[in-house]
């Protein structure tokens, strides 16, 4: 019996040693959903600082299918950090995990404002794999196109279709009006617009727009966090965290999967109910991990416009949809 026990211990130790040797022998690791830099560094017996150094990471942000170097030495300048050029003129850079507009600008001796202008960006959010122009002139697709000319209809007034990179102030300057006037014409109560949206730019406000949205916050007491976004890149949780930060109502980075957000938010002191407001978080437990969305607008007919990721498109792709009034109560709202 004693010999069998000793043999079993030796066998187990041998298996563990082989597994450890295989892990240590690996030079790269492909990130899996839910993994963190801590878990990966622990797996390969290296420090978080070493892992970040090997991969030129400036934050703890990683995303599924990203290939990380786990041994060897870091490259002072990787191929991806060198801008590519094309026949159309100008140079391009592919965004890496941990990049920011300011960091990219400093690499290529320009300003983040210039990169935003070159790429028609109207906010600071970029994502790994995104191709950004870092030198040259703004492409024609980012400049005014035929769609920048307002269309007219029999009901009076002119309309404009929002393009990527537009803002209310930019549109107003194109048509010799003010952003306040455009907001009034379209019944807008915030600055949020999205590509493909049709805006009235001249004429009179229609009755249907006079009360098209509500912004009543009902006096919610909202805690505010200033955490770093540690949610998995491209997921619904990642997007909603960023949108709340944009409006100055940052949330915790430790609520985990979407199906836990209502309970975690309640524990942190947030109000949870079934009444959507602009800026609130729509949450459901439906699905394996649940889902969260950001409420962009509450319409007069009871429907809501939401923005989300990883719902009707691949992770990292921002989409919008209108939730019908009869489905609004299917969600809980974090204020």
UniProtKB/Swiss-Prot annotation:
Primary localisation category: secreted
PANTHER family with a match to the protein in the record: LYSM DOMAIN-CONTAINING GPI-ANCHORED PROTEIN 2, MEMBRANE-BOUND LYTIC MUREIN TRANSGLYCOSYLASE D
Localisation per UniProt entry: Secreted; Cell surface
Residues spanning the signal sequence: 1-25
GO molecular function terms attached to this record: lytic endotransglycosylase activity; N-acetylmuramoyl-L-alanine amidase activity
A GO cellular component entry from the record: extracellular region
Official protein name in the record: N-acetylmuramoyl-L-alanine amidase sle1
Biological function: Peptidoglycan hydrolase involved in the splitting of the septum during cell division.
Entry superkingdom: Bacteria
Species, as recorded: Staphylococcus aureus (strain bovine RF122 / ET3-1)
Biased composition (Low complexity): 71-86
Main enzyme class: hydrolase
